[in-house]
Amino acid sequence: MTPVEEIDNVVHSVFPDWQVYFYAIPEEVINNKNVTQVLITESNSDVTGYGGNTFNEMAFGYRLQVFYGLDEENLIGKEITLYKALEAKEWRITDSQPRYLDISQTDGQQMIKNIEINKTLTLDELNQ
């Protein structure tokens, strides 16, 4: 399982109705403000954990940009639930930016949250 697939599984395990996308939100759904959408993009990928003249681990970083549906409530509670689920799979929350309104929209402004997570995986864990 790739790291982004694992993140997708974690998000859907706690919020099955949220839509999760990798690297881009498709045009046909990008304006749907009634559902919470999560955009996952890679922020870091590095080799680490050297031994035997080669690397044995890779460190991954991902940015989760959460576009909350207009009717979504208790955002702090949802974020805590997501953080705990990610931590249970050994993802470390390294940055959690303040929520902000998408002021580029005039007909309904979504709340947006940016979260950075990191995890180091051995090559065996990556099935290499």
Where are these regions (language model features)?
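Amphipathic alpha-helical segments
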Residues: V4-P16, K78-W91
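Short, cysteine-centered beta-strand-loop-beta hairpins and adjacent loop/turn segments enriched
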Residues: V47-T48, L70-N74, L123-N127
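Acidic-leaning, charged glycine-interspersed low-complexity segments
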Residues: E79-Q128
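Short, solvent-exposed beta-strand/turn "edge" segments of beta-rich domains on protein surfaces
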Residues: Y50-N56, T106
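Mid-chain, well-packed structural core segment of small domains
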Residues: M58-A88
